[in-house]
């Protein structure tokens, strides 16, 4: 399975010498907050028409310092809770089996596996490794091992089809793929692969541990170098490979830790005033349950942040509500990271009520906004659990707005305030006017978390990121006078099904390729549990016979399960603008009107 001949023995640098230690003071002016009236709770600067984060910032290493996100994360463990330092606090736990990996063991496994990747497979900085597997402990170790030697991690959904993998391979051009056994046959034949959990995979780490291979040399990666290629759907109907840098991930870790410290400081201040402290989402023994897949930006980013903070990640292979409730009870989970459908399900679950969930103090919600009504219903059922809404994109490496502390968590309907070092604008899409608090427009963001760009697609990159670094989110939003961000609607046409992005154009292309179908359009249909369902409006060819089930089946065999069409309506024509653009809003209103008549 050797990719290249083993390299000559390198000159070794002890791993400890790579570690970044945070002695660097952070200049507050670098946050871009100049001109902001600090008495303004919105963070809006009238002179620049820009919203600035008013949160405290943590140390961030100089951008010119060579540093991988793995080395940065491990460097922070020296300040981790005492249980971690003593080797008793697990880094990872398998939710199903209870197998736990301590922090010393995790760091050792990463280094041993990195040695096998370097010496046996000949992987080098800049190579791309496709990783296709359900979430598991091996995948978490593999991510860090790859990034520690400068190899670009490219996680993909194990539920994707052969056609979808072929497209992703064309984008990322992987040197090798690490795959789950059930996925291997769906990859293009020319891609070299190692099956995760196989004897070959296990030998990569075990041979290093036995001294068979030397440790890899210290890799002097520039922080703006690509660390990961994450896949994001575009409205064109084809996924794009989003280039996330080491700097992006390091900045997210820094922001996460700064917010944790702020919450802890405010709780200590309240305690000094005699106020009863609220439960902390990040106590010394913080344990986070990962029902979201590690290939998703939420799971991928949260893993790096959890490890760097010395917290425990409880990994689920796939989400199941009953299993999640059991895991919370068994492992005393303090924090649950989830998409809105999970919140809805918890409020209705008898299983959740039967379990002891008293350890849970926060549920971190992302992927789509959580409605005020659902938030209030959840608070009624679980009054001691904070809802921590966050907002972000794959293109922003995860959250650019979030909630911190009980006061912010009570702002139902909002997705929180800007994260440290993030700037934002609200832009009128019709006039280009930059708007102030209370005005609705497209959200633009800027900061060290913004992606490098779309791989192999300079036109899409230029259309998404302005020359001065502003990322156009495609979401209709506004800030209120207190700096809370509200997501009103999606300017992008993506359908958000259980936190996944479903591009309607991709489904329309499949439908329109059928000879029995004259025209078709796919729109989001509101659903309390899933968020949105893909609904197809279909125009049959004259004389053609086609049932709703046949329409759903013809799409299902070409796409991953989360992209399936869930509702179908037959119509005489698809409403379009003079330019031929589908008028999706008319179809959504038509769907809602027909439902209300039932």
Swiss-Prot record:
Segments for region (SBD1): 320-389
Catalysis: reaction(s): (E)-4-coumarate + ATP + CoA = (E)-4-coumaroyl-CoA + AMP + diphosphate; (E)-4-coumarate + ATP + H(+) = (E)-4-coumaroyl-AMP + diphosphate; (E)-4-coumaroyl-AMP + CoA = (E)-4-coumaroyl-CoA + AMP + H(+)
Alphabetized UniProt keyword annotations: ATP-binding, Ligase, Magnesium, Nucleotide-binding
Binding, CoA: 318, 498-499
Superkingdom of the source species: Eukaryota
Nucleotide-binding among keywords: yes
Region called SBD2, residue ranges: 390-454
GO biological process: phenylpropanoid metabolic process
Residues holding (E)-4-coumaroyl-AMP: 367, 389, 394, 492, 496
Binding site for ATP: 232-236, 240, 389, 394, 475, 490, 581
EC number: 6.2.1.12
InterPro entries per the UniProt record, alphabetical: AMP-bd_C, AMP-bd_C_sf, AMP-binding_CS, AMP-dep_synth/lig_dom, ANL_N_sf
Any Pfam family: AMP-binding_C
One term of GO molecular function: trans-cinnamate-CoA ligase activity
Cofactor annotation: Mg(2+)
Family per similarity comment: Belongs to the ATP-dependent AMP-binding enzyme family.
Function: Carboxylate--CoA ligase that may use 4-coumarate as substrate. Follows a two-step reaction mechanism, wherein the carboxylate substrate first undergoes adenylation by ATP, followed by a thioesterification in the presence of CoA to yield the final CoA thioester.
Domain remarks: Both substrate-binding domains (SBD1 and SBD2) are involved in the substrate recognition, and are sufficient to confer the substrate specificity.
Name this polypeptide is given: 4-coumarate--CoA ligase-like 6
Organism: Oryza sativa subsp. japonica (Rice)
High-level lineage: Eukaryota, Viridiplantae, Streptophyta, Embryophyta, Tracheophyta
